[in-house]
Amino acid sequence: MNNTDPTSFESILAGVAKLRKEKSGADTTGSQSLEIDASKLQQQEPQTSRRINSNQVINAFNQQKPEEWTDSKATDDYNRKRPFRSTRPGKTVLVNTTQKENPLLNHLKSTNWRYVSSTGINMIYYDYLVRGRSVLFLTLTYHKLYVDYISRRMQPLSRNENNILIFIVDDNNSEDTLNDITKLCMFNGFTLLLAFNFEQAAKYIEYLNL
């Protein structure tokens, strides 16, 4: 110990103290830089989140609008309802002129209707046209006199499957005839509606035209 140079020992202590001081200073500087970086990240987070939100997919499920739609004009355009355009046929029933003497017409009191007739170019095969549906009319007594009449009337309309036959049961012993009429309707794409008087037959047309 007596041979140790005190100057050298003191210089070592001074060097150690200096290293400790530099180390502590470096830690302080590092913590400050970390705090600065953290504050910068906190300031940048809202901007980043806003960018993410603005890039979200807009669809019918989240019901969100882009930011450029926030002005009043764009919002009005977005909320404006489109005008409704009905594609349904008109409510006026078209009646073939061959039905002029049909008592059914006297009972069509709550439905608008007008006569139409066939021309050389435009042939009319229906008795009544209701909402785009072709309707044929037949009575049991007439069918017994002219059995082939209804099948000939159905033939040009059979390519469509939305046809209707209004059949008035105005005679007794109709079971066999009804079976035949039902088969004709099934094989020619007709819906069979049975009525027992002209007033009831007219009600069918009024209901179909609602």
From Swiss-Prot:
Where mainly found? nucleus
Segments traversing the membrane:
none
List, as start-end ranges, the regions of compositional bias called Polar residues.
Answer: 26-64
Q: Which GO terms describe its biological process?
A: DNA amplification; double-strand break repair via single-strand annealing, removal of nonhomologous ends; meiotic mismatch repair; mitotic recombination; nucleotide-excision repair; nucleotide-excision repair, DNA damage recognition; removal of nonhomologous ends
List the biased-composition ranges (Basic and acidic residues). Answer: 65-80
| Family recorded in the similarity comment | Belongs to the ERCC1/RAD10/SWI10 family.
> What is the stated purpose of this protein?
Involved in nucleotide excision repair of DNA damaged with UV light, bulky adducts, or cross-linking agents. Along with RAD1 forms an endonuclease that specifically degrades single-stranded DNA.
From the Swiss-Prot or TrEMBL record, give the protein name.
DNA repair protein RAD10
